[in-house]
């Protein structure tokens, strides 16, 4: 088997984005400053490897503030953002909290709030029950914001009260799918207000474009990331739509389906924005044990975005 040659096309950019790096650093610096345990409301980012690593360092993950028995301990809000009510609850409990919401998600929160204050009813394009969507919808009164998830919902959206409407989007959506939804809304509501700068973040866009760039050359495509990672799931969809029908999401090298790889000559590899590079390294190392590997990294753009952590942790 070792004699078989495999060409790996390594998609770049891939892996951690600036918002994820910032969120992880916030947890680590909080543990250094306050000691363990430091509580984190929801997984700081959607990756099991990252969450397990932070647990080992002293982070305790909870879904509700009520689960924290010792309210004198600090709590961190995840990169996905939280509804306003959660911030109010933390203040009412007199808790020390650190907000690790990605600055690009916070930008969407501010947009939605400002547009609503200017008299607009808000449409959020996103996936129901995703923490980021819950957080964005939780910035406004329930009656001021509606969720649209797909083209059908955009076609059937009823602005029966003829309100002024504006849209914002989740930051981790499929760029192409979202374009189609926006096109439908603009055709139906000619005066709909859109964000000054699109809400899908730079990292989501870059990773999707990088995958799209090489997918048609690949017999198989592996996206390394967790099943609950929205941006990782979107990368699988992009690979399939861009010419590689056998695209799969795997968490780690332990999930490599070797029985399928035997017939492949070219394998594409990328990773979600919450997946550390060590998972890609482990994936390639495992393949090297069985095949003769030739690796080509195909980079479409350099990323140099850095987000500062809160001053209180410096």
Question: Model-derived features: where do they sit?
Answer:
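The feature marks the mature, well-folded catalytic cores of soluble enzymes
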Residues: 1-267, 271, 277-314
